[in-house]
Amino acid sequence: MSSFEYDQIDCETRSIRLLRVLPGRFKDDIECELFLTFIDDVVPYEALSYCWGTEDEGTAPIVLDGSDFFVWKNLYEALRRLRSTDIVRIFWIDAICINQQNPGEKIHQIGQMSSIYQRAERVVVWLGPSDRESDRALSSISSLAKGTAHTVSPSDVKGKRELYIGLCQLKRRPYFKRMWVLQELANARALVVACGSHLLTPTFSVALKVSLKGLKTISRNPTARNTYYY
């Protein structure tokens, strides 16, 4: 299979590329298509907010317009999780929609990022793969978002400890250290958070803020770890 080559983008206009993620099962090859459009066109799309990854994590191939295209493993996992089994999803993803080897194009596209995130139907936050601690924390925060839980039971010592550990793990994730996070989230019309197989509603973002605020209190007062309330 040949390597991918970008079509030229018009840097004199408000043009962007969008990515069609074709439907498939979890273990199928990831197949995508790029197309050119303009920010002001009425094309429904989602914008992905995520952490690129590092060289240590390596890359994995997707099929882009019939050619091999390598992406960082974290983005690969995001595409696997976010891909639908039956419909095409359209995303704006910087690592794919911008030709990273073209400095002039990068400057042009970065200058439009606020508009790109504002125009998106929603911003999808990818926190990365889940683990046992994050599953526990996300489940608890999700319950808070739904209004079904406001405290960790005082008798549930193990639960409080696991929630504390889970929140610490979440806060240490590379995503929260990205300098673009505030701009991307501030411009979002709607927000969905994904972590592994978890896909959480917009109210989750509010609950996450409450939980992380509570985490700061716990961190300053170790005894509060045994009496943690949302």
For the regions a language model picked out, list residue spans one by one.
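Hydrophobic "anchor" residues on beta-strands that sit immediately upstream
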Residues: 90
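Conserved Walker B
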Residues: 96
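Metal-ion-coordinating, acidic/His-rich active-site neighborhoods
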Residues: 2-16, 20-47, 51-71, 78-87, ...
